[in-house]
């Protein structure tokens, strides 16, 4: 059976950061809620199976919450940055935690659906220089990060050929 990789770069960190900066006391939702994220993947898995394909999930890459915070607040005033940080509970780690929730959802979905997941998170975290695997924005893969992901995906192809 042919395999298809299901990859979605969205990790729940797409918020209206300007709105948060303007009103850090308000309720703000990501552009793709965790419930919608899981439903979207569940639908894609069903579509792949309906086409006779074996779906394979790919975990989310790591992220650097401090670099990402600097990225999402660039161009903001000091007060707006403080407002965003306040909304995050005073810690940029909340960004990493939100990202991790979406990543864990992928692993749970793979288990429930009995499908394979390519874990790119672990080798990235295991890297001594994991910060070099990310671009300046703290969430986009650098060329080195892309090479690591390609190597992990290559392991699947090598396993299939064996």
Regions found by a protein language model. Give the residues of each.
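Alpha-helical cap/lid subdomain in secreted, periplasmic
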Residues: 1-143, 147, 151-162
């Amino acid at each position: 059976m042919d395999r298809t990789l299901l990859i979605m770069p969205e990790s729940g960190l797409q918020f209206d950061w300007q709105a948060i900066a303007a009103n850090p006391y308000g309720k703000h939702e990501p552009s793709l809620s965790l419930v919608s994220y899981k439903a979207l993947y569940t639908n894609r898995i069903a579509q792949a199976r309906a086409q006779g394909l074996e779906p394979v999930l790919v975990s989310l890459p790591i992220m650097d919450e401090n670099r990402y915070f600097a990225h999402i607040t660039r161009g903001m005033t000091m007060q707006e940055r403080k407002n965003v940080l306040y909304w995050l509970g005073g810690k940029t780690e909340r960004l990493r935690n939100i990202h991790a929730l979406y990543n864990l959802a992928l692993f749970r979905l793979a288990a429930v659906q009995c499908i394979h997941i390519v874990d790119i998170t672990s080798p990235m975290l295991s890297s001594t220089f994991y910060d070099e695997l990310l671009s300046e924005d703290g969430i986009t893969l650098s060329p080195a990060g892309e090479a690591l992901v390609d190597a992990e995906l290559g392991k699947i192809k090598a396993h299939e050929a064996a």
